[in-house]
């Protein structure tokens, strides 16, 4: 779900950083009139513009409920459903894919969801500059681009340097939940998360899919192709 498009906010295109890890892929895509209308009319209520200074998430949401960061949400269907299932939890959903941003805003409005805020920016920069240490109760990264060719593995999001940046943002007792339909990437994810002494696997290796996570289009696609799906849930213990 982090296999996304143009890195721009609704008001301003952001510069790329090709030599660093990014949470997205630059691709052209078509935005429907309904998606654009959702951005135009709902962004002020549910969108958060990027800033290079720490943000007060409780103030942005208007609540002190637990906060979950979601990196990459595709077209937003799973994000909206998770928020519907967990109304007492706030979700900060980040993606750069314009149609997906518009579609998630549309779903937020249609389902009367008050516990999601949306950002359209590189999640790596958001994590680095906007999120305060200890501000998150959980992190969801579902079906990031597997970059299946070996020469492209260095572009994968789930690498030790990025996890090291995420960990300080997570409260002790908070969790990281990853999911992929690419077995070799699942093995890499397991190795990366297991390498951190401050993270504890909640399962022997791969976890049962938690009840809150619905089947995504990426998961359905993988099953059609005969792929398995692997969930990993690690808890911060220190």
UniProtKB/Swiss-Prot annotation:
Biased composition (Polar residues): 1-12
Listed EC numbers: 2.1.1.33
One Pfam match: Methyltransf_4
CDD domains membership: AdoMet_MTases (cd02440)
Protein origin, superkingdom: Bacteria
Active site: 145
Record key words, sorted: Methyltransferase, S-adenosyl-L-methionine, Transferase, tRNA processing
Pathway(s) the chain acts in: tRNA modification; N(7)-methylguanine-tRNA biosynthesis
GO CC aspect terms: tRNA methyltransferase complex
Molecular-function GO term, any one: tRNA (guanine(46)-N7)-methyltransferase activity
Region: Disordered, residue numbers: 1-20
Catalytic activity: guanosine(46) in tRNA + S-adenosyl-L-methionine = N(7)-methylguanosine(46) in tRNA + S-adenosyl-L-homocysteine
Residues that hold S-adenosyl-L-methionine according to the record: 70, 95, 122, 145
Record-listed substrate binding positions: 149, 181, 216-219
Function (record text): Catalyzes the formation of N(7)-methylguanine at position 46 (m7G46) in tRNA.
NCBIfam families in UniProt: tRNA (guanosine(46)-N7)-methyltransferase TrmB (TIGR00091)
Homology family: Belongs to the class I-like SAM-binding methyltransferase superfamily. TrmB family.
UniProt-recorded name of the protein: tRNA (guanine-N(7)-)-methyltransferase
Organism: Neisseria gonorrhoeae (strain NCCP11945)
Name of the coding gene: trmB
């Amino acid at each position: 779900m982090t296999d996304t498009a143009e890195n721009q906010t609704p008001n301003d295109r952001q510069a790329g950083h090709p030599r660093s890890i990014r949470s997205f892929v630059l691709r052209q895509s078509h935005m429907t009139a309904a998606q654009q209308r959702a951005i135009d009319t709902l962004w002020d209520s549910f969108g958060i513009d990027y800033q290079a200074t720490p943000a007060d998430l409780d103030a942005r949401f208007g609540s002190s409920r637990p906060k979950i960061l979601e990196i990459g949400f595709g077209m937003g269907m799973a994000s909206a459903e998770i928020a519907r299932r967990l109304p007492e939890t706030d979700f900060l959903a980040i993606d750069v894919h314009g149609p997906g941003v518009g579609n998630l805003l549309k779903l937020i409005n249609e389902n009367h969801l008050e516990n999601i805020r949306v950002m359209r920016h590189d999640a790596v920069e958001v994590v680095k500059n906007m999120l305060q240490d200890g501000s998150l109760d959980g992190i969801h990264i579902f079906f990031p681009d597997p970059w299946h060719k070996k020469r492209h593995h260095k572009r994968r999001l789930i690498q030790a340097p990025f996890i090291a940046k995420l960990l300080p943002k997570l409260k002790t007792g908070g969790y990281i939940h990853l999911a992929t339909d690419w077995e070799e990437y699942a093995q890499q994810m397991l190795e990366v998360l297991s390498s951190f002494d401050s993270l504890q696997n909640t399962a022997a290796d791969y976890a049962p899919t938690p009840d809150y996570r619905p089947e995504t289009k990426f998961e359905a696609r993988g099953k059609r192709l005969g792929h398995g799906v692997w969930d990993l849930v690690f808890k911060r213990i220190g």
